[in-house]
């Protein structure tokens, strides 16, 4: 009940139920200048906490939906590990004899005889061609089926792309159009099991046609399945595996159970529509591959999944999935996050990967997932369970297309040395999700410690195109879309496997991605030395929650540079600090970014207590301030350009020390150029504030040791520098002057806060100094000049003892 109440509260907070939820706002009044510091925008930190709480609810709904124990795998060994084979009708038969001529399908007394054959009935040894040309003979004679672009690499003993193949034994499975393929397949493959060797692997051809499937298919080492133009449709009503390696759960373990497997082609329709009790707990995995080395699945189409994975790998090394299509899932099932391609670990804890023994914790390494299509599915590929002390290594996801993916496209959990690059994702709930660990962590046998929280993950997300859907809720709980999400994990109390501590994500590079649509662009939390560069983030404002362009929450050593961000409902680029980042010597850098049209502040550093710098950024047309620093310390705002923002150009508030505001240009902002509010700053120098509607600098109750060499021009308020309750400082007004005519021989007026006033004349693009005057105790000045022609442009520049200057322009009458 508490969870349901919390879900309702969160839904209301995020606007999911249509109930209005007041935005966090701050309105501060100080005398006549109240309108300079009145702010009404959503508090980014509160907004992010609400979003994270909602997504935590989603995580709790995503429970693994593995096959129920009562649904045995037809034609696979029973759960007791016996040596017998279970037939499709559930009966148990003894071991198959050497003479397979009496084998029948589905337990019938049919007369079909299964045999090895070439075209004329014998096995043929076919030499693998030396060239690398693509197979163009899918419709030719059977002897042509051995040609393949990557065949030499598919059975390599080392990397998936290396090695040479000897000869194939080419075999054609004898089946008729519309026939149940289960028993003929398992009979033939079992006979070939001992004949297929590393030197002479077997290539089995399924002829083009349409076939049914009523049980689990078994495949063994050194086998190449060629199934192009074959359509295999599951017609059984139970939930069972479609295909596995071996006919028993037991193997040698590690990566040594099976080797050299190729599945080439076929349309595999899992046909969830035929399954009884679809809404009961559990789905069924399609192809389940475990404890294996050198596995290739290519050119295949997988359709209509029921609450689980199309392909599942556990403890596999050197795998390639290329040129495949995954489409269709049971849409009534919204709680889970089962991936089309699941990269998993060998453990039976929580029913994670029960199909292969031993449960030794072996993870996956050296995967290439390239050129596939994922369409109208719940989740694309990745991992949602892990082993303590082990990682998934060298997973490469490139050149894939994701379209209409409800949740995540790519999920890297506990990965290292891995890449997601040049993928296209359109109308998706999340592009790339990277996380260090999760509560779904299992104990590795013989390992008693937790994950290595100092490990450099060396992960790269680059060159992807991501267009986010307008999804606001899934299963009645708010869903927050994100283009790229990088998350550490805060284990707040000791668990069964994970000890209490913070597990950051270290060493992630996010670069050259294009992100658009509804949701957050790039988000990071509890990260360490991660880099976000050269990305284009073009968001649309959402009605249900307030989205961000790029944010780094409680992170150390983040570099956010050369990105373009626009259109967010909240802050364009946001950094916030907390427990993990506090006191870190690693510097956060926000540099050379362009932010426009943000619904909140352009760049916002909130409660950041580690050394952080925002420099050389351009921020324009934000609904809040251009650059804002709230609380925290040791932050720098250097060399930025802030123009046409609806609040201040630069806003500094409640900081406790070590903040420098230097060499910024703040222009045409709706309020003051620079606001200093109840802050301890180190330096305000070298800034240029012009054409702002308020003051050049507005300072209230702040400590300012140095304020020098700032330039103010054509700001709306008389006070170029407005100071109140700032010890040791007085305001600086712009110089005023009496009317200057063509007969005038002097320019006179007042210049409060300045020491001198200089007059210049501008003619034909050239500037000539006319004279200078000191300012007396009555704040008056008189500059003697020669008579000037009518309509001559004059410029008056006042300067105080710290080199701060105020410029006004006038014309000779």
Q: Which sequence ranges carry the predicted segments?
A:
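Sec-dependent signal peptide cleavage junction
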Residues: 16-35
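Ser/Thr-rich low-complexity repeats and stalk/linker segments
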Residues: 729-813
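N-terminal extracellular ligand-recognition/capping segment immediately after the signal peptide
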Residues: 177-186, 200-240, 268, 302
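Right-handed parallel beta-helix
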Residues: 255-404, 409
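Right-handed parallel beta-helix/beta-solenoid
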Residues: 30, 37-39, 144-187
